[in-house]
Design a protein with these regions (language model features):
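Extended, low-hydrophobicity, polar/charged segments
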Residues: 2-147
Length: 147
């Protein structure tokens, strides 16, 4: 992000911390402002999976998301498949680390409520805080209903 001159702040924490909820506590931010990145596949799979960024306090509704994306059916990728598709470890999957790799990135629409969001920097133990507008600009993400 330095290369792209995007203002941001990096948070480092113990890599054993796995949940976005725990990260929210450590960063002193509400869980709604901390985004988790989920790998979601069409069912049956076709092409690259979706990277779905959403507030950590929310649970995904695959039927709602499928309708938002114009898909008949979606499924969560397994941890193994998520790591295979992204070459990143679960807990460190980040759209920011996968720029220009052909993934379709979507952000759950409630994240628009916040000026700044925190998300994985692409490695366990590192998160990055940036303006929501910069995240959308960098990733080309579109806002969708997913809950």
């Amino acid at each position: 992000m330095e290369q792209r001159k995007v203002p941001h702040e990096v948070f480092e924490f113990d890599a054993s911390v796995r949940s976005a909820q725990e990260v929210a506590q450590l960063a002193g931010m509400p869980p709604e402002q901390v985004l988790k990145t989920l790998v979601v596949e069409a069912d049956p799979p076709k092409g690259k999976p979706y990277l779905v960024m959403m507030p950590s306090a929310l649970e995904i509704d695959l039927k709602v998301l499928a309708a938002s994306l114009g898909e008949k059916k979606l499924r969560m990728a397994s941890h193994r498949d998520s790591e295979r598709h992204t070459a990143l470890k679960v807990g460190g999957i980040s759209a920011l680390a996968l720029l220009d790799r052909g993934f379709i990135v979507v952000i759950e629409e409630t994240a628009e409520l916040f000026d700044e969001v925190l998300m994985s920097a692409g490695q366990r133990g590192f998160d990055v805080k940036m303006a929501y507008a910069d995240l959308v600009s960098l990733t080309g993400a579109r806002s969708v209903a997913a809950v």
